[in-house]
């Protein structure tokens, strides 16, 4: 690979990593803000520095091709662009601005800060008029938007108003003309998004609150939108202010809109409550105070957690000028959202660049070194192990490393998990450690050996690719573990009052793993089984003092039953990796098992009869597999996901919600424990040539001492269940996946878990305009035939960004054009005009502008 190819690959990987810091589209507390039409507005980079903004909608494309000169669209971004326009090849002047140098410079900064930037079409300026007149016009308009404002491609020879920078999607704020053509545009854009499978693009709508919306109801009902920014202002019959004052006086409420969205082209689209940012931003009687906003947000976030997405604020400059307690209005609204969110999660995304690992543990501490490229909200620190323990672990040729460390008092414990893609031995030796567990998995042959003396606790760890696990015990504090997988291969070991136990497993796909435990004077047993194919391991033991069960699986179902036992194990099903950390306080105490969620998980919890205590904990989101069919003579159905077989157990009682009950233990003060899970998994997506499989690695962090388990909301009748944290479901059209264009539903990771906290350091940017000649290009060619397909409903996942106080910006605004707000309807938009002052400035600076424009 030459230097050029290496550089290109590095840029591509870096771009993907930066994108991973962006929006969590299915959180309940996202804040969207419109920008581009404020009087004397600050530039885009100033607002991107604000930690409260998740989505910034840039407005507007206010001239549509059917009304624009030469069949081109036109734009208006207030004072952020020079009065310079594109010309066609034959010399026709269009209304599309080509002097938006500040936006060109600011968009990459906004992307680096994790902001999602949408380009809005339409707007509500009184003197504007726009509409789509034909299906051909709708298709060409969508193609033009993607070519001009989407990712830069060598095939596009038309204009690029924002240069090489691209937006993250498009917003439809249609308040003029008719409702024709917009569903066609949305479906076409969904097809075009497939050309850039490494990035996520969004489509939003901003209807008036009156139902049905005159201009967007047809598009919302017949195409897939990700976000619905409802303008609950400027219409007294459905304003949010009126609902707060007297809910019974409102004709159309959030409840009505939720019902409508759940029957729309995307039943899992997120609803945003749109509010004016000040009394002057819209009708002054529709302005809500923070207390009034809290009332409506807390009510509907709790009532519709799967549909509620956050708030939309019109607009950024009005918010900046309306400060409450020193904070802009939008920042206050973000704080309202975060306070109302019952369970704001945290997460870490990691990209591994090196597989070398070295682990050494002295009698006082353990040091682990891993070369990784990571973005983390939790600083890493070395783990420590209690004195009187010596461990040595070597690993070579590995391709992915997982390390999880748990600390407790009397006794502390350390868990080390290492994965390898080649044959390697891993040996661990320990003398008198309170608790040590070593787990290694490999794609070929590997051996794990553990030796310990007088360990007071027992740990059983099972990893598999497709397994069922059941646990049962009768009239004994001991526990019986049985693991089954679909293919053949069985090894069974039974032990009664034996000081040591050896379990070996085998699978039909030339995988061999051995776990050996030697102990003296201890009733403990250590079992470790992992496979990517078929394995069956059954172990039975009596008179063991304590047992902990840890399960990791990729589609797995686990059922547990117990009669007259002292504890209850955990049962989980997952589509990826799951990590369970065990903490014990002494050799005589019962144990507690905490399990973390993994993508596409489902939990089944069983209860024992006649047991003095129960221990079970699982936090997960049920997953439904969504399939879509394209009607034709030979229907094509694309189904994503891998359903698992049902659980087989003698007696199973499933409670309505997972719960957590801690087993009795001795009174001991514990150190704070943090559970970190590194997950490597694969998913299917669509590229221009068809289906492709992508392998990713990401990390989640969980602190059981400070976090509380919240019962999963019961599924809404008729509504698909959302995917788990960090994952989302997209609906798109794949022309290459079947003989005819087919709508597919894909479960993929979000572009990021969360945006890490930013520092107070603020960049100082000096903007130097670069001379640039007007670009003269022809109108993009018209597209061919279009096949209308039915889109399926993407699933949802909920995750919340941690709030950070906004920082001020030292960036000086250098407007190159000028405009001020005029009369508006709905979401107000300014009409761009050349005022007298601007003309005088241009006349006075003729020489400079002549050089600037290349004349």
UniProtKB/Swiss-Prot annotation:
Similarity comment: Belongs to the glycosyl hydrolase 18 family. Chitinase class III subfamily.
Recorded topology in the membrane: Lipid-anchor; GPI-anchor
Gene name of the encoded protein: CTS2
UniProt main location, coarse: membrane
Signal sequence annotation: 1-22
The enzyme's E.C. designation: 3.2.1.14
Segments for region (Disordered): 341-672
One Pfam family named in its UniProt record: Glyco_hydro_18
Naturally occurring in which organism (per UniProt): Coccidioides posadasii (strain C735) (Valley fever fungus)
Domain of life: Eukaryota
Subcellular compartments: Cell membrane
Name the UniProt record assigns to this protein: Endochitinase 2
